[in-house]
């Protein structure tokens, strides 16, 4: 595991440099991505994310925020030294994680509210996403997908391959097509790998897409390392998967640096045995303040504490930024702590 630099920091200002007219003239998503998806290896394929430029969003145009620049509670890219970042975005009672390295950027889930998501992306200067990975169809993970249309340019949307034609996911496919300006959603399966600069996202499970419910959530292993070199840091992204779903992968995954806790820290999100094997230094929970579900539960917080994890929650900390380097993982939170 990489050493952890957990000194949370504030950044006083987010400056937005480009005018609203720029986004009208953005080019279409890179064709190389479509070519890369055209050939599938027998057990494993790599989906190369070539990297759109992550240009600053224009606050007045996209989010309607006034007086954002200079706010002491906002975290800007660069508040951690590395360009390689995984950011648990504060989207209320939902999940959205931004993975970026230089010009490459991928979003894992979107949360529910398009306005909230766009504000979160604006805080980090993101106007283009090479891909959006949807763990499952629930509105708190996929509800904001269609809201990206015409605002944030999206190269690809990926769901489980079994859901590309499934009746249960007609609305999800429609939202994806809207975000993709009429293009189609694409399928992934265990063994597929999405690359984001020096990051790789390997799909571990499930084998079957099911009905795209919580238990059918896509579980991704996020790894960071120098290209062609050894893995320097690892994280497990579980969607709304809980103990039963984590049980299918945790022994193969082994020691990780951070865990994106499943199902917003629900009662059965993770157990002591899984924590003993995974040993995450950080546990990230996407959760809304004062939610009606009691998330995160005291039971799960106790499991995480016994497992030695530092718990960071979007309801308390806002956006949680992990900055990766060959030496350490630096942690920055929007609200401090």
What are these model-derived regions, one by one?
Residues 1-337:
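Non-globular, low-confidence helical/coil segments that flank catalytic cores
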